[in-house]
Amino acid sequence: MTLLTQIPEWRALETHYRAIRDVHLRRLFAEDPGRGERMTAEAAGLFFDYSKNRVTDETLRLLMALAEARGLRARIDAMFRGERINITENRAVLHVALRAPRGAVILVDGVNVVPDVHAVLDRMAAFAEQVRSGAWSGFTGKPIRNIVNIGIGGSDLGPVMAYEALRSYSRRNLTLRFVSNIDGNDFAEATRDLDPAETLFIVASKTFTTLETMTNARTARAWLLAALGDDAAVARHFVAVSTNAAEVAKFGIDTANMFGFWDWVGGRYSMTSAIGLSTMIALGPDHFRDMLAGFHAMDEHFRTAPFDRNLPVIHGLLTVWYANFFGVETVAILPYDNYLKRFPAYLQQLTMESNGKSVTLSGEPVTYQTGPIYWGEPGTNGQHSFYQLIHQGTRLVLCDFIGFAETLNPLGAHHDLLMANMFAQAEALAFGKTTEEALAEGTPAWLAPHRTFPGNRPSNTFLAERLTPAVLGALVALYEHSVFTQGAIWDINSFDQWGVELGKVLAGRIAPELMSEVAPSPAHDSSTNALIRRYRAWRGRAL
């Protein structure tokens, strides 16, 4: 593929950027009174207002032309056809199959995978109902009241986010906890107040060899056996989400209680697979299927909608526009709903593990910026924290506001005040306050520079009627496909993650040097060697 920066469509955008880079949003809105209603799109229960972006109709036309030139439509079709678009691992990328309806046909190597997907979903539903109803009891006969999901990365971030987002729909007599970090403090605090006889562990690891997950799983087994004293208890208090039946059985888990998934499901795209078992237990199968339906609605919108009305495509192209032309390095995710407090962390993995790449699909170094940094905090907490920098700092930050017309917990004027703040922040970022306006308000001349807001800070706003399982599914799918769009433009592989491997290898070498009773002779750089010696000295081990 021709280098991105050499194609005519990219050159046209460079020329266009130079023409409009200093145009203020105040001017764009003044010259086009209908802009706020025209630059919107809607699908799958989500309303998308992108009018507060530093773009014109010509910008959007040029971005759409770029998408066509980079073969975005063909790449979308290839993913949905089950082609092996993850070329470095020779795998299909078919998280969309996980939420396809029962009668759909999606082929991988000529085999329809949808029946197998629904077979796993049906097994998950049956097990979830057993736990929720109390029919599944622990080793002592007590019903299960506590669910602890042990995983890391995609086996943790998705389930945590979905549970927190949809907690209002959950079975409140069940306690859900999540353990991911190999730091023992994580496990200790998650289980401190739990009764082992009433606790079920879900161990989520495709290979059942993941260091962090299996370290925590072995600790969980020891914790359980210390209380119940019989190895047979493991089979009543542990289930697995894995494809390694031999390791699952060796651990003591009945393989009848092993829920599998496929190598065409990437970890950060896996929350709608068996990785979502804890979510299904918490919400119930019906709400889980509602969430899948929301995912599927956005999948179909992404697959079929024209690019100029396609929410993920527009969102992804705008991200490219800011990253590559304005030099924007970060995107702030600002959900004005406390149930979405873990959504920014979830998107960090989805976006940064996907598009944090520096070589093209053909292995050539890129000559342009790729994935930006994602971060955020629920409103209005962030307003009293980092919004100062977004409003008056020297860095341009792209903001995504997410809000809902109805709250799940009506309490007086709380929700109206919350949403007033969201709308106000987007308005303030876009239009700011001039020095003249500050002076007209009576601000002393010496103070006016400090009370001037430059504005022209871009933002997107997503609005839905209320946060439901279906809306959450649509929202997550939108970001998944926005990431895909960005990766297609940049010609990178959004579906591998080789960057996490080197640290794992080095940790495997260093761990014995930390734990050895005999002083090792570490062969690292002088800094790492000194840190190892300091650590061993403070741990009271031989030097």
From Swiss-Prot:
Its EC number is 5.3.1.9. The keyword tRNA-binding does not apply. InterPro entries: G6P_Isomerase (IPR001672), G6P_Isomerase_C (IPR023096), Phosphoglucose_isomerase_CS (IPR018189), SIS_dom_sf (IPR046348), SIS_PGI_1 (IPR035476), SIS_PGI_2 (IPR035482). Transmembrane segments: none annotated. One of its GO terms (biological process) is gluconeogenesis. One of its GO terms (cellular component) is cytosol. Gene3D superfamilies: 1.10.1390.10, Glucose-6-phosphate isomerase like protein, domain 1. It catalyses: alpha-D-glucose 6-phosphate = beta-D-fructose 6-phosphate. Pfam families: PGI (PF00342). This is Glucose-6-phosphate isomerase. The lineage of its organism: Bacteria, Bacillati, Chloroflexota, Chloroflexia, Chloroflexales.
